[in-house]
């Protein structure tokens, strides 16, 4: 079926519009079937059979669950979730050929004169949205974005991650990640944060709205096929964390985007505002996205070595060394907002200095202690990212840095188990401990010089991202803040 559809579109692609097998007319610029090489269309019968099976499963689930609308989700370059809805009658056609849309108003996408885009849903991401009514139900699918000629759109962050993962796959590796996304509940979003509770780290607060919010959020995530390991109250008042089960990086990036929306939707349902802003409250801990990660070769954890004193393989050590070496230049991707750098300061358990350790949580990279019989759990934890990053781009640059370490055979420096925040500057210098960028401008300037980041993101996203962040910094630099008014107005 898929083959005949492609050939039919090929036959009619000489006309001003491209008529698909299902009778849907694409824009004149849509030449995907015409320009694709023959061997790409007919890769293998097995691949087509798998795609047809996925499509059939989606159509079956949609029918069984009385689905009437499907939301196609994707992100802009900043990781802001975008999407549009199609009716169930359009679902089969969307799975086969994608859906056309105008990308000119989406951050980092195309100009208005070249804005025709195709969103093709990934059938593996089909899930019913639980907070919508079961009658005339709504489902969601993540979509990959394509150019009118059928090639992957270089401004699509999901494609950037898929390309990075393909590079790892070509070397025999699969990246698994487990991010810890922290967030705050506030009473409203009116610009004056008001705590919902006064609990602290691991506190069992009374049965209040925050406890119920977390419970309902977890049940909603589980209903969408996203497995939760545990949840708890974090250090700051009204700060919470729900940890998702370790899985492959693409699935986790999709899950992270879903998680952020679910947290906000459930909060909104109860008249509460949830935020992933890195540092919403002065004098309190900010919210991080500590990212646990490891490489697997088949079912074997490539990071594990039973003979090493740290139970880390040479691959793991080189990967970690790559993360450490390139951490400064990827920081603008993993901590992408002006506000991110209010979190990355001493005194609030967020990393500032570039080092690694096992027990020391002031280090940038931490290796959780090995437990006998848990070889597959061997991993490293990268502690600087925050939950407001774009997970597709963040996972991509982390992986690129780690693979560069493996490729070049970087040597991992000795661990630093002392509290780096208590060290003198001379002591840090003696240990060769550098620091992360102190603000967004410094981070962007380092990224701008990075061949690794440019190569990973591709020229389009790299340039658009740099441009966007320079504008953000200029807006911040020229803004007269409340701090300045309170400090200077009475005395100057």
Give the ranges of each region predicted by the language model.
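Leucine-biased recognition of intrinsically disordered, low-complexity hydrophobic segments
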Residues: 7-10, 19, 25, 40, ...
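Glycine-rich, acidic/polar active-site loops that bind/position phosphate-bearing ligands
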Residues: 51-492
């Amino acid at each position: 079926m898929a083959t005949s559809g492609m050939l039919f579109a090929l036959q009619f692609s000489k006309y001003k519009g491209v008529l698909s097998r299902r009778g849907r007319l694409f824009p004149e610029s849509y030449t995907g079937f015409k320009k694709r090489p023959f061997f790409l269309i007919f890769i293998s019968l097995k691949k087509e059979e798998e795609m047809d099976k996925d499509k059939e499963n989606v159509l079956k689930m949609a029918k069984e669950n009385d689905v009437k609308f499907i939301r196609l989700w994707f992100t802009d370059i900043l990781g802001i979730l975008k999407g549009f809805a199609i009716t169930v009658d359009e679902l089969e056609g969307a799975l086969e050929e994608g859906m056309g849309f105008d990308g000119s108003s989406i951050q980092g996408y195309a100009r208005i004169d070249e804005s025709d885009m195709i969103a093709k849903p990934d059938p593996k991401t089909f899930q019913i949205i639980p907070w919508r009514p079961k009658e005339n139900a709504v489902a969601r699918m993540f979509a990959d974005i394509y150019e009118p000629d059928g090639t992957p759109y270089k401004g699509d962050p999901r494609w950037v991650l898929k390309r990075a993962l393909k590079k790892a796959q070509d070397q025999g590796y699969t990246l698994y990640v487990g991010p810890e996304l922290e967030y705050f509940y506030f009473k409203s979003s009116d610009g004056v944060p008001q705590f919902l509770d006064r609990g602290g780290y691991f506190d069992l607060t009374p049965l209040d709205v925050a406890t119920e919010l977390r419970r309902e959020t977890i049940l909603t995530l589980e209903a969408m096929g996203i497995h939760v390991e545990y949840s708890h109250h974090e250090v700051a008042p009204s700060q919470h964390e729900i940890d998702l089960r370790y899985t492959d990086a693409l699935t986790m990036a999709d899950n992270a985007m879903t998680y952020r929306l679910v947290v906000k939707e459930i909060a909104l349902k109860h008249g509460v505002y949830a935020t992933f802003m890195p540092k919403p409250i002065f004098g309190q801990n900010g919210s991080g996205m500590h990212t646990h990660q490891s490489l697997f070769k088949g079912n074997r954890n490539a990071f594990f070595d039973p003979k090493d004193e740290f139970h880390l393989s040479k691959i793991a050590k080189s990967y970690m060394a790559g993360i450490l070496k390139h951490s400064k230049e990827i920081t603008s991707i993993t901590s992408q907002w002006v506000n991110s750098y209010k979190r990355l300061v001493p005194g609030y358990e967020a990393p500032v200095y570039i080092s690694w350790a096992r027990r020391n949580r002031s280090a940038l990279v931490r290796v959780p202690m090995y437990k006998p019989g848990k070889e597959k759990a061997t991993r490293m934890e990268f502690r600087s990212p925050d939950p407001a990053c774009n997970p597709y781009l963040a996972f991509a640059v982390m992986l690129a840095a780690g693979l560069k370490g493996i490729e070049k055979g970087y040597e991992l420096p000795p661990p630093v188990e002392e509290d780096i925040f208590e060290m003198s500057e001379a002591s840090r210098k003696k240990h060769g401990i550098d620091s992360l960028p102190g603000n967004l401008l410094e981070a962007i300037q380092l990224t701008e010089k990075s061949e690794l980041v440019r190569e990973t993101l591709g020229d389009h996203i790299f340039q658009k991202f740099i441009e966007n962040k320079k504008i953000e910094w200029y807006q911040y630099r020229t803004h007269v803040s409340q701090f300045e008014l309170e400090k200077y107005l009475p005395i100057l």
